UniProtKB/Swiss-Prot annotation:
Protein's name according to its UniProt entry: Outer-membrane lipoprotein LolB
PROSITE patterns cross-referenced by the UniProt entry: PROKAR_LIPOPROTEIN (PS51257)
Keyword terms: Cell outer membrane, Chaperone, Lipoprotein, Membrane, Palmitate, Protein transport, Signal, Transport
Native species: Vibrio vulnificus (strain YJ016)
Subunit structure: Monomer.
NCBIfam families: lolB (TIGR00548)
Location in the cell: Cell outer membrane
Protein's UniProt keywords contain Mitochondrion: no
Residues with lipid group (N-palmitoyl cysteine): 19
Gene3D superfamilies membership: Lipoprotein localisation LolA/LolB/LppX (2.50.20.10)
GO biological process: lipoprotein localization to outer membrane; protein transport
Length: 202
């Protein structure tokens, strides 16, 4: 608790100055085709903003996410560009590098981020969810464009609801695939608003 409080107290001046399978679900041919395209995405880079709201804290951070099958790196920065958190995930576990050069490791990335910052973010599932692929979801719904509208997932006995409110067409392998531009994650009184401003796919 002391480490977490100290972490955000040190950041406060900076803020002031500036594959599990898919669930059984009725699907259309269009969704199956879209899902197949998403499954071909092995690596991506996503740049955007994350807003975090809970009874304990509110944070607005920029993020840069570089993901590949071998390693995933998620970096949060303040609006001044100061690195707040640098998370690296591999099949062997997770490592966090903080703004003051602390390095902490754990088997579970979500637990490590929460321990250090108090932020509850299901980062291990987000690599699929942020591209609109409901891997591991307990249930999901499609919109009229046959892309993901929402999904539900129980994690550690807590129900997460993810809503997709906007998509953007992104070039991938000489074709266009719609990817999420705005989504929100809700778990009881915790809410995360994610806006992806730039996608790069490989």
């Amino acid at each position: 608790m002391f480490r977490r409080t100290y972490f955000w107290l040190m950041l406060l001046p900076l803020f002031m100055v500036g594959c599990t399978g898919l669930p059984d679900h009725p699907t259309s041919v269009e969704w199956q085709s879209h899902q197949a395209k998403l499954s071909q995405i092995q690596s991506f880079q996503a740049v955007g903003k994350l807003g975090y709201i809970s009874p304990d804290q509110r944070q607005n951070l920029n993020f840069y996410w570089k993901h590949s099958p071998e390693q995933s790196n998620l970096r949060f920065t303040t609006f001044l560009g100061q690195t707040a958190l640098n998370l690296t995930m591999t099949p062997q576990g997770a490592r966090v590098e903080t703004y003051d050069d602390q390095i902490l490791t754990a088997a579970n990335a979500t637990a490590l981020v929460q321990q250090l910052t108090g932020l509850v973010i299901p980062v291990e599932q987000l690599s699929d969810w942020i591209i609109g692929l409901p891997n591991g979801a307990d249930d999901f719904q499609l919109n009229e464009q046959n892309t993901l509208s929402s999904l539900e997932k129980d994690l550690n006995f807590q129900r997460w609801h993810i809503a997709y409110t906007q998509y953007r067409d992104v070039e991938f392998h000489q074709q266009v695939v719609p990817l999420p531009a705005k989504l929100s994650l809700t778990q009881q009184d915790i809410k995360l608003n994610i806006v992806v401003s730039k996608w790069t796919l490989k």
